Structures are given as C-alpha cells and as structure tokens.
Amino acid sequence: MCSSDLLTAEDVRRLLELEPNATCGFVRITYASGQSIAAGGLPVPFDDVRPLGSALYFMVTPTAPVRLHRIRNDQLYHYYLGDPLEVFMLHKDGSTGRVVVGPDLRGGERVQLFIPGNTFHTARLIGRRRWFLGASTEWPGVEPADVEIGNLDALAAKYPLVAGDLRSIAASVRPN
C-alpha cells in the first residue's frame, strides 16, 4: 500500500495549503515565471505584461468540481493522486470532448490533458476516493481577467449532447 492511499481530501488540502477557488475546487499557485513578455508581445487578446508561464495545484471533491469556465490561455492538466477526473470540453466548432485524467493508462486514462485556450470545460470525479489532486500549467501565465465562467443555459443549448452532464456537475457546486 502506498502512503498516498492513506491520505484524505482534508489531509491533501492541509499539507499543500490549498484554498477554495471559484473555478477549480481548491487551489494553490506554485509558480509564476519571473520572466515576462512585454505588453504588445503577444497576439490579441493578451494586451498586457505576462509571465512566460504559471502553474498551480488543484484538488477536486464531489462538492467542489471544476466549474464550467474557460481561460484565454492554453493549459495542460496533470494527474498526481486520488480519483480520476472526467473532463468535458466544449470546442468552438460545436464538437465536444470527454477525456478521463487519471492513472489507469491501460484503461484509456491520461496523466496529462491539453486544453486549448478559450475552450469551455468542466470536470467531475469518478472513482471511490472522492478527491482528485492534479496541476495545471499555463502559458502565457494566467491573470484573473483571463477566466470566464460559462453561462450554463446557453452552453447546454449549444452542446445538447452533454447538456445533462453540464447540469449535473453545476448542481454539485458548493455554495460560496
């Protein structure tokens, strides 16, 4: 038995000093590049100074899923510990994607998932442990203005094949 098998969600939150987050369960920013890109050095919509990249831990629980949102930046999800995470992506062309981020490579899960910038996405746990610990790396570095919460009704209408999943995940979000 691995020592991580004995961890609870509360242990992970405490040990990694994770704080509640409006979009991604519980979060702690772990890196923002000390090097930056000057204003005007990136394509639209990035019009201000940006770190080259950023990274954060995030933990998802049944009542703190990844809310329906998008960020301007490309991002890469990484699996670390706990349950797999079922991620729903809503692509600009009207198609959808469903990918499970987790440890079961033989079962088709991935330990990394690329999410293109401006892709609405949401996620929920699948599994028995009731928590997921992962990370997200982004480039350029994310600023609060880069994050947009999705309009559930509008996106459910545009993506009817996953509307039930979107509503189910949204219903589990803890009150702020």
What name fits each language-model region?
Residues 108-122:
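Conserved SET/PR-domain catalytic core that frames the SAM/AdoMet-binding pocket
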Residues 1-3:
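Short, small-residue-biased leader/transition segments that mark boundaries at the very start
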Residues 8-108, 123-129, 137, 141-176:
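Active-site region of the double-stranded beta-helix
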